[in-house]
């Protein structure tokens, strides 16, 4: 909306520009002519050091977007707010799309998770709950969950919102809840969010040693 791109043209433009970025990273002279972009023998003066290019991770929340991630990127970046059962089904979609594109499993399969460690689950819920719940209430008002399955609305009581979605508890609790992501799905790059809007920094710092030393 901010760039006045009609909804019906956004995906096509995204795909077009992603391919252009990759060409600019790897080709000496790039020419392109479309409705929204004209390039005539353009060359990037400063190119990425990584060869052939930096890996591209595409986040995706629904089947078509996950298929696009398999087709156009080096890895599907798994979101932090889908429930475990949904991710299990989406992994099937992703793997099928990889096979259809004659691509092997990615070297890195990243996931982001909302995680907070404390001495036990009740304490973690009590401490992190107000900040994490507030964040997802805002997401719900923005309509961010409209791309999610109907039963995964963010407009739920916190106890229901957490189930199968966020990792809150003791280090042992967190470890047990994270295990399926690497044992079953092969995810090998974990990005953690443990500090949310309004949370004093010292509270997040209390969680971090438990994650780094005991998780």
Name every feature range the model reports, one short phrase each.
Residues 1-214:
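Active-site-adjacent structural elements that line small-molecule/cofactor binding pockets in enzymes
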């Amino acid at each position: 909306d901010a760039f006045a791109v009609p909804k019906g043209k956004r995906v096509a433009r995204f795909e077009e520009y992603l391919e252009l970025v990759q060409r600019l990273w790897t080709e000496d002279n790039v020419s392109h002519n479309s409705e929204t972009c004209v390039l005539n023998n353009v060359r990037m003066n400063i190119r990425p050091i990584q060869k052939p290019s930096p890996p591209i991770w595409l986040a995706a929340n629904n089947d078509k977007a996950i298929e696009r991630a398999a087709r156009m990127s080096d890895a599907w970046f798994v979101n932090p707010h889908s429930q475990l059962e949904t991710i299990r089904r989406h992994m099937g979609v992703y793997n099928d799309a990889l096979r259809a594109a004659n691509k092997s499993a990615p070297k890195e399969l990243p996931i982001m998770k909302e995680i907070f460690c404390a001495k036990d689950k009740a304490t973690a819920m009590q401490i992190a709950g107000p900040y994490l719940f507030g964040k997802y209430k805002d997401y719900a008002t923005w309509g961010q969950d409209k791309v999610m399955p109907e039963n995964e609305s963010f407009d739920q009581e916190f106890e229901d919102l957490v189930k199968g979605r966020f990792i809150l508890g003791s280090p042992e609790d967190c470890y047990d809840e994270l295990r399926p992501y690497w044992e079953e799905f092969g995810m090998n790059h974990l990005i953690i969010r443990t500090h949310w809007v309004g949370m004093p920094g010292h509270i997040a710092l209390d969680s971090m040693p438990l994650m780094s030393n005991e998780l």
